[in-house]
Amino acid sequence: MVRGCRVGQRTGTVGVRVFPVGLCALSLQARDCRGMCGKRLGKVMVLGCMLPGVAARVSLSPKLGVYGDARGGSDLWGICIQAPTMPDTENQAPPRYAPETPLVGLDVAFRAENGFLLQLTVDAALTRLMFCGRCLAGYSFRPGEGSTHLSVAAGFECTALIYDSQHFLSVLGQGLLQPSSSSYSAGNWHRPRSLLGVLTCTAKEVGAIHEESAY
């Protein structure tokens, strides 16, 4: 289940008529990236370009909006900014929060009249150094008259490295004769794993490097 949300405002759409690409039927299975879906997706894209089809539409849609969760938990990617609110003398890591993040992006969609869909998306979250790109292939149809499309697609999603850091100081003893120690938590590079699909994107965090010195 997706924990985040993306609210974007389309700043413009450009349509271009092209010939000839199409695909009448499509069958994709949602598997891991190491499965057969990669080969199947490649065959679908090649087949869609080779088949004689009907006119299609290529749309370019810039996006500008906000991206992320409310305060109090991890966002869609599972990585947040550390917001230290505890005193430095407490032996406790600062809590996390996930503010709304400015987002810029671009969607390039290729949608044939007979349903073949190919979409490329590039998103960048400004305050978190997040960069996400996805390539989707699938089938789209119109549930009613008009320009509304309902699409079913699968593909691959790649995310850039994210830097997350936290710094805190803990004091274990007080007084002249009692031992005390201080600890320091350095920043780490997090790399979310690539997942298959559009609605699932998680990240595994790794432990920080701790340096302790006793006096």
UniProtKB/Swiss-Prot annotation:
Recorded superkingdom: Bacteria
A Pfam family recorded for this sequence: DUF2715
Alphabetical list of InterPro entries matching this protein: DUF2715
Family per similarity comment: To T.pallidum TP_0127, TP_0618 and TP_0619.
Protein's name according to its UniProt entry: Uncharacterized protein TP_0315
Organism: Treponema pallidum (strain Nichols)
